Amino acid sequence: MTAYWISVYREIVDEAKVAAYGALARPALEAAGGRFLARELPEQTYEAGESTRVVIIEFESVDAARRAYESEAYAAALAALDGGLIRDLRIVPGVG
């Protein structure tokens, strides 16, 4: 069953660190089978929605998404991020 990596950026602390992270994270996650579906600010928010960057990545399974997060390549991206960002990251199984 497909799974979705959903990341909501709460606060960008250091733009340079976020850029360094992005340069490493995208290729690491794509190499692990991730397919980027969205990466941007919302066009519209409702209810308690905040206008902060959202990233949605599709994986073939929850296990594939977990393996991507735990990979050496993604660990290097996290090391580059080094506190430059406060975010909410979830891995959610797809429906059906």
Give the location of each predicted region.
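C-terminal structural segments of small proteins and small subunits
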Residues: 65-90
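Short S/T/G/P-rich N-terminal loop/turn motif that feeds into the first structured element of a domain
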Residues: 1-53, 60-70, 93-96
